[in-house]
Amino acid sequence: MVMQFQELENPVQISPCHSHTSSGFDMEVMSMKPAKGVLTEQVAGPLGQNLEVEPYSQYNNVQFPQVQPQISSSSYYSNVGFYPQQPEEWYSPGIYELRRMPAETLYQGETEVVEIPITKKARLGASAGRIKGDELCVVCGDRASGYHYNALTCEGCKGFFRRSITKNAVYKCKNGGNCVMDMYMRRKCQECRLRKCKEMGMLAECLLTEIQCKSKRLRKNVKQHADQAIHEDSEGRDLRQVTSTTKSCREKTELTPDQQNLLHYIMDSYSKQRMPQEITNKFLKEEFSAEENFIILTEMATSHVQVLVEFTKKLPGFQTLDHEDQIALLKGSAVEAMFLRSAEIFSKKLPAGHTDLLEERIRKSGISDEYITPMFSFYKSVAELKMTQEEYALLTAIVILSPDRQYIKDREAVEKLQEPLLDVLQKLCKIHQPENPQHFACLLGRLTELRTFNHHHADMLMSWRVNDHKFTPLLCEIWDVQ
């Protein structure tokens, strides 16, 4: 939940056709057969006859730390009755497991020191020197290479988790989900391995989206170009020639007629969808109890969702998408679009001196500082970019039309709608800020921060659920609150 406060004379009501519960969705997750594991390391001696019982029998003279058996937990969702029943492998950008177990080491005792000096051969693919000491992977017990997706893991578990999430893989355990994960069993049971990854704190939202990867490449390219320009300047380039070249590039960078029409259409829809100013004024002018503050914030969020639905319906090409894809895009982007709109209001719409007052009132609404601090940090980082309303509108549309949302059936169709928006945004950045070639990459980089807020929002929902806070039917629908 986040704070929405913007001027709108007439908030719009959501169309009945968009009241669609998550239980009505056709969850189409590709079923993938587990690949047969192959031992990557060559061993000196023959393996034992029974690999299931003695997987390390070739190492008779070496002592290994004992693995603490991990008890498979039942579905967390079914225990709290918070979200609909889904497989544990299922992830959605707006819905995450709400419990993250601490990355505790699975090993009891200390490894015995061998007096004979032994030179260890580095694992292939491991990043030597990234961590101190012989830290162990919290998933399988192999040598860890660093913190990957929020957990200390080896390169193998890092790659396995990334592939499993990006491909929406669904695995099946032959032992009823009771496998004890170690370096041998990780090759035999992918379901238990993926579950162990999640139990140890690995987060799906830490994976970069296609847009975020593009942002990283842009930052790298910009740095290379900047270094090259400095080198050329040091060799005697005339400063006036550089200024002339910059001016020439700015003149050549302009929107095509089709891009101008697209931008006008987006801006017309974005500017019409505003939230009632009286809610914000009420929140700032009067001081309420924590419960009353929560009710006001709920009203703001409801108004935001109504505005978001209307804006989304008017995005060019959105109505041509499959109906289930439309709902998946709307639900998947609701939290991110909400935070982005709030950042615009925080940086541009609030009167001078009201930002600190707003933060103070929100902290008194019962929301933990654990969520409020990164939220306002994000608002301030966005304000530093000095974004125009055109950039806010385009970035919001890009967030909504993200082809990597869960349960999108026709990702190519969504990507075709998103690409023209990215092109227009990139050109606008060159036109408005030619002296700052990194501006476009910085805008896309904010999408990385937005993805992390999905998890914060899920945690907030859980804490409010425990405290028996009530939500409007619209928020229950869009956030899948039962």
Swiss-Prot record:
Gene3D superfamilies per UniProt: Erythroid Transcription Factor GATA-1, subunit A, Retinoid X Receptor
Comp. bias (Basic and acidic residues): 229-240
Residues at which chenodeoxycholate binds: 341, 371, 379, 457
Keyword set includes Signal: no
Annotated keywords: Acetylation, Activator, DNA-binding, Immunity, Inflammatory response, Innate immunity, Isopeptide bond, Metal-binding, Methylation, Nucleus, Phosphoprotein, Receptor, Repressor, Transcription, Transcription regulation, Ubl conjugation, Zinc, Zinc-finger
NR C4-type zinc finger span: 137-157, 173-197
Residues in the DNA-binding region annotation: 134-209
Phosphoserine, modified sites: 145, 164
Span list, region Disordered: 229-253
Subunit note: Heterodimer with RXRA; the heterodimerization enhances the binding affinity for LXXLL motifs from coactivators. Binds DNA predominantly as a heterodimer with RXRA. After activation by agonist binding interacts with coactivators. Interacts with NCOA1, NCOA2, PPARGC1A, CARM1, SETD7, PRMT1, GPS2, SMARCA4 and MED1, EP300 and SMARCD1. Interacts with XRCC5 and XRCC6; decreasing NR1H4/FXR transactivation activity towards ABCB11/BSEP. Interacts with PAGR1 AND NCOA6; indicative for an association with an MLL2/MLL3 complex (ASCOM).
Identification of the protein by name: Bile acid receptor
Species for this entry: Bos taurus (Bovine)
Gene, per the UniProt record: NR1H4
